Amino acid sequence: MALTAHPSCLLALLVAGLAQGIRGPLRAQDLGPQPLELKEAFKLFQIQFNRSYLSPEEHAHRLDIFAHNLAQAQRLQEEDLGTAEFGVTPFSDLTEEEFGQLYGYRRAAGGVPSMGREIRSEEPEESVPFSCDWRKVASAISPIKDQKNCNCCWAMAAAGNIETLWRISFWDFVDVSVQELLDCGRCGDGCHGGFVWDAFITVLNNSGLASEKDYPFQGKVRAHRCHPKKYQKVAWIQDFIMLQNNEHRIAQYLATYGPITVTINMKPLQLYRKGVIKATPTTCDPQLVDHSVLLVGFGSVKSEEGIWAETVSSQSQPQPPHPTPYWILKNSWGAQWGEKGYFRLHRGSNTCGITKFPLTARVQKPDMKPRVSCPP
């Protein structure tokens, strides 16, 4: 009986071999003795992610981009300070500019609306649990969604926030309509991007949201198709607030009340596969945030190598490595991307601007707490 391997496994092996020789800008014709390996890796990429191209010229163009992105993944691997792994992803045949146009949004956030803010600066800092993962509460987090070519991460993050709060607060397992947020948005730009508060304003204006079942996602804005009173509302919000730009406070709130939305710089995500991203402000500017996601937990991981780092002095004893603290984030690019649709960012260094817009809806009175505690 012949042995077979899944395309993703073969692709990983081929890419690992190619990466050993990649150190600079790369095109298909620059590979010298390696063109067959590159072409085979690209063929497996097409099979795994169901890619086809309209002409030989387009195929050659995408092959060049694929080769360039292999080199870029290698550079990211060398620059990252965490445990992240970069390589072939569903977006490996896109240029950085194309990826940004499809999934990022660079609108200046000067129009931040007036909203409530969490004011706790005079209170002593409370302890934060070692870890918190709302995914471990049965059905608390709705399934991973795929925004496809509609740049609506802002709407999907807001919908995920509302769904989760209803699930952990009231045991009401609803999936709310992202399409209603797109069709009825009065502040956002639909599939051209927006901010999470745009979605929350629409929810307040519409007195709630219909279900995903009644008002399903179409992947595009439908002009003159906003019918906020046509379908029964299954979830609504009291208001929304901006949390303090402090990772300790964000962790406290997350563990106590549930997942929140954050808006980050998505630059390292195009070629991300798994692990904890720890980028520097130079490689991932915390001021240039362009992608909204749902923050669902936090924890720590030991050094992947599992070895003790030697100190500068040869006479000193080796010291155990410090654990790497991380945030767990739910993305909206489908379950084939990242860690089954999730990813992790370093916690404690404002990686990729995670503290810039920590925003959440509220679906209950401020003095009430959810009926469920966040499991470690």
Curated annotation (Swiss-Prot):
Protein family (similarity comment): Belongs to the peptidase C1 family.
Gene designation per UniProt: CTSW
Protein name: Cathepsin W
Lineage: Eukaryota, Metazoa, Chordata, Craniata, Vertebrata
Tissue note: Expressed predominantly in natural killer cells, and in cytotoxic T cells.
Organism this protein belongs to: Homo sapiens
Enzyme class: hydrolase
GO molecular function list: cysteine-type endopeptidase activity; cysteine-type peptidase activity
Active site: 153, 291, 331
Intrachain disulfide bonds: 150-191, 184-226, 284-352
Known function: May have a specific function in the mechanism or regulation of T-cell cytolytic activity. (Microbial infection) Plays a role during influenza virus infection in lungs cells ex vivo. Acts at the level of virus entering host cytoplasm from late endosome.
Annotated Gene3D superfamilies: Cysteine proteinases (3.90.70.10)
Annotated glycosylation sites: 50, 205
